[in-house]
């Protein structure tokens, strides 16, 4: 069946369950569908339908299908930044938006902008990061003055394609401006260079929101921080998917990193962090990614949206898997090299990291009860 026909059939369904677990945070395994491109392209529409957005905004199904075909073309077959990734981010974001606090906070327009941003946020990704673009002095880095190079490209290309297709021509002038402006802000927030700043701002906004009396509303600025945070969280959600999915994605992340590192070596460019296959350890790097980036951000989001606590539970399980793998590798290496003293120090350090994580998680659970 052609994509447009399948999309029409989906959009006309009254009860579009379509895929088992698609509406649940833990129950949907997108890795089983990674090579079923047409099926992947239906998932964003299914997510819009969950909130009735296709009807509320009178989205033209054929135009939407055409946009999905453009997404298919522009999402290249890199190990990680591919069609499966942007579809996964969209489906995951849909589960965040369905939480009780998010449903009460966001408007239908907010949800539409966020979901369209999710499917568009990596359009035409080149399989290398911003630092590579800057060091390479690529056309994109020059065009965007070395600032959020790829994110600006994703925004400009996706909005250009939408305009060409007339995808949102039915929106009024004010709504269209809100759509394009907020979409730009949201996709820019997926730049990992913005991570720590966004995390700090999120923690402050969360304190404000918790202190707000029932019935009072957040400022538009603070609400945008929460919108950015949920999209960014969906973009870095691999570590808190069930272990088999987490490991599947991690393998692809590091494959793409190492392919970039190989290019950097061949082109005599500085090798980016985590991109040297000869020195980067996937297990240790994954624990550090969880501890320094994912954990603080997920915990802050969970303070704002308590239903996300189940993801924290899964994160703890996956962190233990990576930590156990790291300790085993260290033991195998150091015992073979007869470095018992170094091994004892290393194991003690990793046990200390785990204790710190577990303590912080216990405090989080207590605070949201």
Segments and roles (model prediction):
Residues 2-39, 47-55, 80, 95-108, ...:
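Divalent metal-dependent phosphate-bond-processing catalytic cores, especially two-metal-ion Mg2+/Mn2+ enzymes
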Residues 52-78, 98:
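Internal amphipathic alpha-helical repeat/solenoid segments
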Residues 62-63, 85-88, 223-226:
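Helix-boundary capping/turn motifs
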Residues 68, 72, 90, 117-120, ...:
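Generic structural concept
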Residues 81-93:
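Hydrophobic alpha-helical transmembrane segments corresponding to the first two to three helices
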């Amino acid at each position: 069946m052609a994509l447009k026909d399948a999309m029409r059939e989906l959009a006309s369904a009254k009860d579009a369950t379509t895929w088992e677990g698609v509406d649940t945070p833990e129950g949907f395994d997108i890795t089983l569908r990674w090579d079923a491109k047409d099926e992947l392209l239906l998932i964003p529409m299914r997510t819009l339908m969950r909130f009735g957005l296709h009807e509320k905004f009178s989205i033209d199904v054929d135009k939407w299908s055409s946009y999905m075909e453009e997404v298919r073309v522009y999402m290249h077959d890199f190990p990680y930044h591919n069609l499966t990734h942007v579809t996964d981010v969209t489906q995951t974001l849909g589960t965040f938006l369905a939480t009780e606090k998010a449903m009460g906070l966001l408007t239908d327009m907010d949800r539409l902008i966020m979901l369209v941003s999710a499917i568009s946020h990596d359009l035409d990704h080149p399989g290398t990061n911003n630092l590579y673009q800057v060091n390479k002095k690529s056309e994109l880095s020059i065009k965007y003055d070395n600032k959020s190079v790829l994110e600006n490209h994703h925004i400009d290309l996706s909005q250009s394609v939408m305009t060409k297709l007339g995808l949102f021509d039915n929106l009024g002038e004010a709504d269209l401006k809100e759509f394009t402006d907020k979409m730009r802000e949201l996709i820019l927030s997926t730049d990992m260079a913005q991570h720590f700043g966004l995390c700090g701002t999120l923690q402050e906004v969360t304190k404000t929101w918790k202190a707000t009396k029932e019935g009072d509303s957040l400022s538009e600025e603070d609400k945008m921080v929460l919108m950015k945070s949920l999209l960014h969280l969906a973009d870095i959600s691999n570590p808190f998917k069930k272990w088999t999915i987490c490991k599947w994605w991690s393998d692809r992340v590091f494959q793409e990193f190492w392919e970039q590192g190989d290019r950097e070596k061949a082109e005599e460019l500085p090798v980016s962090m985590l991109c040297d296959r000869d020195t980067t350890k996937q297990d240790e790097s994954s624990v550090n990614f969880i501890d320094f980036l994912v954990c603080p951000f997920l915990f802050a989001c969970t303070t704002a949206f308590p239903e996300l606590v189940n993801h924290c539970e899964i994160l703890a399980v996956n962190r233990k898997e990576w930590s156990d793998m790291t300790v085993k590798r260290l033991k195998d290496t150091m015992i073979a090299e007869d470095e018992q003293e170094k091994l004892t120090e290393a194991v003690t350090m990793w046990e200390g990291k785990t204790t710190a994580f577990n303590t912080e998680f216990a405090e989080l659970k207590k605070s949201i009860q």
